[in-house]
């Protein structure tokens, strides 16, 4: 039986003026996701998706490139102003934020939503080099 040809779905342009940027910066990678007010993803990017591999994913420059790519995708949907939620202890927090500002977005608020335990799980052992 012949396979049915898969259609390529074209992304329709949504007119969304404001959104929320979630910057998840870990020790190994930086993920940037732009959502609307309800939490539906509009655009996303990461340092690994931009072609950085290994330890280069955790650099501030890789986070900047990922944020610029995500900003370009969001501007295609007509987005103008952003709220920023930063999560995680990684190196790409500030550089991703600066890249969004230089892309021409109006940043209305910046929130740090890094989860901090109230003496919850035992942390992993200290690294000895």
Swiss-Prot record:
This is Small ribosomal subunit protein uS11. SUPFAM superfamilies: Translational machinery components. Keywords: Ribonucleoprotein, Ribosomal protein, RNA-binding, rRNA-binding. It comes from the Bacteria. Signal peptide: none annotated. It comes from Bartonella quintana (strain Toulouse) (Rochalimaea quintana). HAMAP family: Ribosomal_uS11. Disulfide bonds: none annotated. Transmembrane segments: none annotated. GO terms for cellular component: ribonucleoprotein complex; ribosome. Part of the 30S ribosomal subunit. Interacts with proteins S7 and S18. Binds to IF-3. Belongs to the universal ribosomal protein uS11 family. GO terms for molecular function: rRNA binding; structural constituent of ribosome. Located on the platform of the 30S subunit, it bridges several disparate RNA helices of the 16S rRNA. Forms part of the Shine-Dalgarno cleft in the 70S ribosome. It holds the Pfam family Ribosomal_S11. InterPro entries: Ribosomal_uS11, Ribosomal_uS11_bac-type, Ribosomal_uS11_CS, Ribosomal_uS11_sf. GO terms for biological process: translation.
